[in-house]
Design a protein with these regions (language model features):
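Acidic catalytic cores of enzymes that act on phosphate-bearing nucleotides/polynucleotides
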Residues: 52, 213-216, 229-356
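Flexible loop/turn segments at secondary-structure boundaries
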Residues: 85-88, 113-115, 138-141, 173-176, ...
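Short helix-loop-beta junction
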Residues: 94-103, 152, 276-287, 360-364
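C-terminal amphipathic alpha-helical interaction region
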Residues: 400-423
Length: 423
């Protein structure tokens, strides 16, 4: 299947023995059994493994119906959330929906005054609907933005504002109570799913549906990838092999992982990936610092460091198949010095830049290569599920909890004290 992912260590052979990677994966074969069982020891955090427990046919139909209503009536749809509450949706929307009948705007991801003021100006004269996503409805950024935006809606639309507001939170939370009291539509943020693992719940799917993403195809890609990983032997399992390679390189002194991609549509996906691994793996003084590099643009900046900088970075190339060759480069009679490009397409240029980068960088640092299909709903579904499973496997190998974030909670407590919040 084109959306499945393959791992190659060809460009890491000077730093990493493939047999050692397979041996390490084999030593952790029990992690596949744990995954098949739905990570029983973390049942209250691994709801994302039970794909259709929270996202069944009735849930999908309800999301599709609400999304169709918003597309009929809205000029602008505002997604209020931060981090795991919006990264998955944003990565798919920005990649797959370039032409939009409804403008999507983002709020609740910054405390900068300029951002909320700019957003309010962009809303003027438009028919606006909003979705506030907050699992426990205590995070500062979405809470503050929601207060400003709901006031705007009620001042602009009066009683009609209620149907323009939907909220995604945990059942019986404060946000759920506000929905019942004010007539806002409520969607579920499952208790058993953390924000960074929430792509396949109403958290991620509802905004995608509003923007016209085929959420059924996305779920299909995730289901196929999950079935593939849970059915593969340890020594042939791409997620377990990727986790094993990362772990071995960490043990050999590498301290950062650069996700490099030559498809600009993956830019927001890389932000999701950074949060997934940073928040899951970075604790107890351990973990690879997750970074990203968008090419070929950043070959002219980070490429220098990757080829001749400090030897602490491993590079993972995420390669998607091209869905188009792009325009052909044809001569126009001018002696511009680029005659060697005559007859070539942009896909040829991209492939050449990718290959040259892997060859050049692999002389200085280990380069892993992950290959998948062209950008599509199925591919993104597969990518989300692949990396979530690989992340859990990596954390298990490192001996850290993939589902908590004590450092984030500590910063929040300090901020709340500074703002005068009691308790």
């Amino acid at each position: 299947m084109s959306e499945l992912i393959t791992l190659s260590t060809q460009y890491a052979k000077n730093f990493l023995d493939e047999a050692a990677v397979r041996e390490r994966a084999g030593a952790y074969a029990h992690l596949i059994d744990e995954a098949r069982a739905g990570f029983l020891n973390d049942w209250d955090s691994a709801g994302w493994m039970r794909l259709f427990e929270h996202t069944n046919e009735a849930s999908i139909r309800r999301m599709e119906e609400k999304a169709a209503e918003i597309r009929r009536e809205a000029d602008a749809f505002i997604l209020i959330g931060v981090g795991g509450s919006n990264n998955a949706a944003r990565s798919v929307i920005e990649a797959l929906v370039p032409d939009r009948t409804v403008e999507i705007l983002y709020a609740g991801n910054t405390t900068a005054p300029s951002a909320i003021e700019r957003l309010l100006r962009r809303m003027e004269g438009k028919s606006v609907f909003i979705d506030i996503i907050a699992k426990n409805f205590e995070t500062l950024e979405p809470g503050a933005a929601f207060r400003v935006l709901r006031r705007y809606l009620y001042e602009t639309y009066g009683t009609d504002a209620a149907r323009r507001i939907m909220a995604t939170g945990t059942p019986d939370s404060r946000l759920h109570r506000l929905c019942r009291e004010n007539g806002w539509d409520f969607f579920t943020f499952p208790e058993t799913v953390g924000g960074r693992y929430s792509a396949f719940t109403e958290v991620g799917l509802m905004p995608m549906a509003v923007m016209g993403v085929d959420i059924r195809a996305l779920l299909g890609g995730a289901e196929r990838m999950q079935r593939h990983i849970l059915g593969a032997a340890a020594e042939e399992n791409p997620a377990l092999l990727y986790a094993a390679a990362r772990t071995l390189l960490y043990e050999r002194g590498y301290r950062a992982e650069m996700l490099t991609f030559f498809e600009p549509r993956l830019a927001w996906f890389s932000k999701w990936w950074i949060q997934l691994f940073g928040e899951s793996e970075g604790k107890d003084g351990r973990g690879l610092l997750p970074l990203s590099c968008e090419c070929s643009e950043e070959l002219h900046s980070m490429g220098q460091f990757l080829q001749q900088g400090s030897e602490t970075v491993l590079e993972t190339f995420l390669c998607t198949a091209e869905d188009s060759d792009g325009p052909a480069l044809r001569p126009d009679g001018l002696d511009d010095g680029f005659a060697y490009l005559d007859g070539k397409h942009f896909a040829d240029l991209n492939a050449a830049a990718l290959g040259a980068s892997m060859r050049a960088h692999s002389g200085h640092l280990p380069c892993l290569q992950l290959c998948t299909g062209a950008c599509s709903e199925e591919t993104f579904g597969a990518l989300f599920q692949f990396f979530m499973l690989a992340c859990v496997f990596s954390c298990r190998m490192a001996g850290v909890n993939p589902f908590d974030q004590p450092g984030v909670e500590a910063y929040k407590r300090s901020m709340f004290r500074a703002l005068g919040k009691e308790g």
